[in-house]
A protein has these predicted regions:
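Nucleotide/phosphate-binding catalytic cleft detector across ATP-hydrolyzing
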Residues: 1-115, 132, 157-160, 166-167
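Glycine-rich phosphate-binding loop of actin/hexokinase-like ATP-binding domains
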Residues: 65, 111-153
Length: 167
């Protein structure tokens, strides 16, 4: 949550940048870094629910944001791996956010939706309401565990569990 005074009584891009900077001024562990600062809503003089405050008038601007952090070492290792392949990293994006760009519509984000991406090793979750991401999470239970559970229950090979789980 960031709070700043609106300098000229009208919200300009510089005011938005300042309030976002204020919102990210939180203590995070040294082994973590901020990956994304995702604005959820703005508040001008206690008027809540503002999505686009540019040009609006007031004296106090607040921003409610969703901060996404990641392990510094994990990000560095991903970047090193990509560079070893002869490619450059333009940006690291949270998996749930990237998935949401490819499968959700603006209407779904606005109405409210829970995106659940069941991968092999983890299940990634993102909750959207009123057009903004409100929560992200990772559950360490996913497809590989389901496959192994099926194979164990049927006392068969994991490869058979894969076939059953995907049918």
């Amino acid at each position: 949550h960031g709070i700043v005074a609106i300098k000229d009584k009208e919200v300009y891009r510089a005011d938005l940048e300042r309030v976002i900077d204020a919102a990210q001024a939180v203590a995070i562990p040294a082994d973590q870094k901020i990956l994304h600062i995702l604005p959820q809503e703005y508040i001008i003089d206690n008027q809540e629910g503002i999505k686009e405050p540019l040009g609006m008038s007031g004296v106090r601007l607040e921003a409610k944001v969703h901060l996404v952090t990641c392990a510094v070492n994990a990000a560095q290792n991903i970047e090193k791996c990509i560079r070893r392949c002869g490619l450059e990293v333009e940006e690291i994006i949270l998996e749930q956010l990237a998935s949401s760009y490819s499968v959700l519509t603006d209407d779904e984000r606005e109405l409210g939706v829970c995106l659940v991406d069941i991968g092999g090793g983890t299940t990634d979750i993102a909750i959207f309401t009123e057009g903004s991401i409100r929560h992200t999470g990772v559950i360490p239970i996913a497809g590989d565990q389901v496959t192994n559970d099926i194979a164990m229950a049927l006392r068969t090979l994991s490869s058979v569990g894969v076939v059953i789980a995907s049918s």
